[in-house]
């Protein structure tokens, strides 16, 4: 079968890889000059299934109001008056209750845990190297309230079967030695030992080369103008004067998927702007060992081979990719506070990207009402975490094979009135980990 994939970020490339392994004739189209040039280029580097959770959670609306007046707030909103933004924000607010949160989180954890297993299998099969580490993630708490809340909320992890350990401030240095010097600023941490880290861009570039060797064709520097429809299916992709035809099509355009699908399939995917700093390491002993997540500022600090990646924050500002100096100040403040001697901040590379977010936090993976059109988008801040699982899942669906995990509630059909997912036991009715 001929398959055209639109988008060469980590989600598009993993989709291409798994489809090619099934024997399909795969073509990937992207407007950039190579893979992983946009959202996948500078993310925080976390592969954190245990922390897979929607931004839409109980208490977030009130927190968002408070954050409006804080200099280093993790979330910022700038209204542009567009119907897309207002509608998406309203849908997100409707998901900010405990019942929706538990359903959405259970979906996200299911896919994220599966994705980590797929990545592990891919790594074993190919030997792909991407500065990956299997050292876990350590969530850091700065207040007693944060620590106490975590102690109450670990039932979420128990329910999902995710290993964890709750550490006191004195125990943090046993897993992150450089934190010994700043333990007095912290009240403890929650460690997930099975989480991983790695350079998403490097992974995507190298997997793209492997996919090309497996027969995948990449067409770069080519903008997609329109999807052509005949009856109940896609007839081709219009790229300038050319029409590229296939038997099946996959939209993996990230935050730009919504506009491409306008008038064909309605999806609630909106850009959530994030930032990162990439800092050269000057003293390995003073740098993080794996990944730490600052709960107060929602900032992740990740270790690559000879670099530190500091990433996070969320701005609801439309498709604006300009670099905001105030956001750099926040990233610098957090890394200086926790790892003051780990790297040379004066040589840091500042970056921003647009994460494709759904209002319920769950990505959209699967078929659409157009019988040969498939979606793999809306992964938000967890594209790297969920990429391999989403790619394998989509390949199974296109192949007509029953997926390894329940997937009906991951498709766009879940937004349809009257949708009834398969019966899956929900997570415990407790407060979310935030």
UniProtKB/Swiss-Prot annotation:
Transmembrane segments: none annotated. Pathway: Amino-acid degradation; D-alanine degradation; NH(3) and pyruvate from D-alanine: step 1/1. GO terms for cellular component: cytoplasm; plasma membrane. Its EC number is 1.4.99.-. It comes from the Bacteria. Keywords: FAD, Flavoprotein, Oxidoreductase. It catalyses: a D-alpha-amino acid + A + H2O = a 2-oxocarboxylate + AH2 + NH4(+). GO terms for molecular function: D-amino-acid dehydrogenase activity. FAD binds at residues 3-17. Pfam families: DAO. Its cofactor is FAD. One of its GO terms (biological process) is D-alanine catabolic process. PANTHER family: D-AMINO ACID DEHYDROGENASE (PTHR13847:SF280), SARCOSINE DEHYDROGENASE-RELATED (PTHR13847). Belongs to the DadA oxidoreductase family. This is D-amino acid dehydrogenase. It comes from Yersinia pestis (strain Pestoides F).
């Amino acid at each position: 079968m001929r398959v055209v994939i639109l988008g060469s970020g980590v989600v598009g490339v993993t989709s291409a890889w798994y489809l090619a392994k099934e024997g399909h004739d795969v073509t990937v189209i992207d407007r950039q000059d190579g893979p992983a040039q946009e959202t996948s280029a500078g993310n925080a580097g976390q592969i954190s299934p245990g922390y897979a959770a929607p931004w839409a959670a109980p208490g977030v609306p009130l927190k968002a109001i408070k954050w409006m007046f804080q200099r280093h707030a993790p979330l910022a909103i700038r209204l542009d008056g567009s119907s897309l933004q207002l509608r998406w924000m309203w849908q997100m607010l409707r998901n900010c209750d405990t019942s929706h949160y538990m359903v959405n989180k259970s979906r996200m954890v299911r896919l994220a845990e599966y994705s980590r297993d797929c990545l592990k299998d891919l790594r074993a099969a190919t030997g792909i190297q991407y500065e990956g580490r299997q050292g876990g993630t350590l969530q850091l708490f700065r207040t007693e309230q944060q620590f106490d809340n975590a102690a109450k909320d670990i039932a979420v992890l128990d329910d999902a079967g995710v290993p964890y350990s709750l550490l006191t401030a004195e125990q943090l240095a046993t897993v992150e030695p450089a934190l010994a010097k700043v333990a007095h600023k912290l009240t403890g941490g929650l460690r997930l030992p099975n989480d991983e880290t790695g350079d998403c861009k490097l992974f995507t570039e190298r997997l793209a080369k492997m996919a090309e060797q497996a027969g995948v064709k990449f067409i770069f520097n080519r903008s997609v103008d329109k999807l052509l429809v005949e009856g109940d299916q896609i007839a081709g992709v219009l790229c300038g004067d050319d029409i590229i035809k296939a038997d099946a099509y996959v939209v993996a355009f990230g935050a730009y998927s919504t506009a491409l699908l306008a008038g064909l399939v309605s999806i609630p995917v909106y850009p959530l702007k994030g930032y990162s700093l990439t800092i050269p390491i000057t003293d390995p002993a003073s740098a993080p060992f794996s990944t730490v997540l600052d709960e107060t500022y929602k900032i992740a600090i990740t270790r690559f081979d000879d670099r530190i990646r500091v990433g996070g924050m969320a701005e609801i500002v439309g498709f604006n990719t300009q670099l905001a100096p105030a956001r750099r100040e926040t990233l610098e403040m957090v890394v200086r506070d926790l790892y003051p001697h780990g790297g040379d901040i004066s040589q840091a590379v500042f970056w921003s990207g647009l994460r494709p977010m759904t209002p319920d936090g769950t990505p959209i993976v699967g078929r659409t009402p157009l019988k040969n059109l498939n979606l793999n988008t809306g992964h938000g801040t967890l594209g790297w975490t969920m990429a391999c699982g989403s790619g394998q899942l989509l390949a199974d669906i296109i192949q007509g094979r029953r997926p390894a995990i329940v997937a009906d509630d991951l498709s766009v059909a879940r937004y349809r009135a009257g949708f009834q997912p398969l019966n899956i036991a929900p997570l415990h009715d407790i407060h979310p980990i935030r």
